[in-house]
């Protein structure tokens, strides 16, 4: 599987998972994956284009009962501020990431004519930052290459961090004239009884965001009572 598909709030979300090394998203041992994909003469470029073709075919066949195409939010390279992914700050230069993002959008949107993808960028913002706007604009591909501005915010019980980052997000959204939302958040296992009302809802009511999405629930045999974020 080369991308992960989730459904929430009437929208589909998609993100790439498997790098060309054969590992998963966390396989950052090879820092030249993106560089290889960007080389039009490389076998990695040809393979990645095949992946994009498969995604394009999927998107163009995703239709509702009325026959209309179903839109879904596509955030292929989420948390690009972090070092863990093969597309992240450890494995790419600023220009490589920007070129990679634009290459992806250009091929899907302009070459394949896919227009039901909503391209979302989503830096990770867990703490309070002296330059939150700079984190939101980190390796910004350009206004014409992004449709939706998100942030992944695992603030735990630090409501002040969530509040300040939401404020920065909505300000950046207004500046760019693009919708915004929280593309990942939550606390593992919910240790606070009023977590939903005080740590999530209260900060959200002060800002205008389009959505908030919790991270997954996953059954793990040795910690089945721990890894859940959504209920």
What are the residue ranges of the model-derived segments?
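Acidic (Asp/Glu)-rich catalytic clusters
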Residues: 2-8, 58-68, 138-144, 169-175, ...
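Substrate-binding cleft of extracellular glycoside hydrolase catalytic domains
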Residues: 2-114, 215
């Amino acid at each position: 599987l080369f991308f992960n598909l989730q459904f929430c709030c009437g929208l589909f979300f998609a993100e790439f998972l498997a790098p060309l090394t054969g590992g998963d998203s966390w396989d950052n041992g090879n820092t030249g994956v993106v560089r290889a994909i960007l080389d039009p003469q490389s076998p990695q470029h040809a393979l990645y284009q095949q992946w994009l073709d498969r995604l394009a075919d999927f998107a163009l066949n995703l239709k509702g009962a009325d026959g209309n195409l179903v839109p879904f939010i596509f955030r292929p390279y989420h948390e690009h501020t972090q070092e863990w992914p093969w597309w992240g700050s450890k494995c790419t230069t600023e220009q490589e990431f920007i070129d990679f993002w634009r290459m992806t959008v250009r091929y899907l949107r302009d070459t394949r004519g896919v227009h039901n993808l909503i391209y979302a960028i989503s830096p990770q913002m867990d703490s309070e930052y002296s330059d939150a706007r700079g984190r939101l604009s980190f390796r910004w591909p350009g206004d014409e290459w992004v449709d939706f501005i998100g942030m992944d915010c695992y603030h735990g019980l630090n409501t002040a961090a969530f509040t300040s980052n939401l404020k920065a997000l909505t300000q950046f959204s207004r500046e760019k004239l693009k919708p915004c939302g929280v593309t990942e958040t939550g606390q593992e296992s919910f240790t606070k009884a009023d977590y939903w009302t005080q740590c999530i809802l209260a900060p959200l009511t002060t800002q205008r965001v389009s959505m908030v999405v919790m991270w997954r629930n996953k059954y793990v045999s040795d910690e089945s009572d721990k890894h859940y974020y959504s209920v």
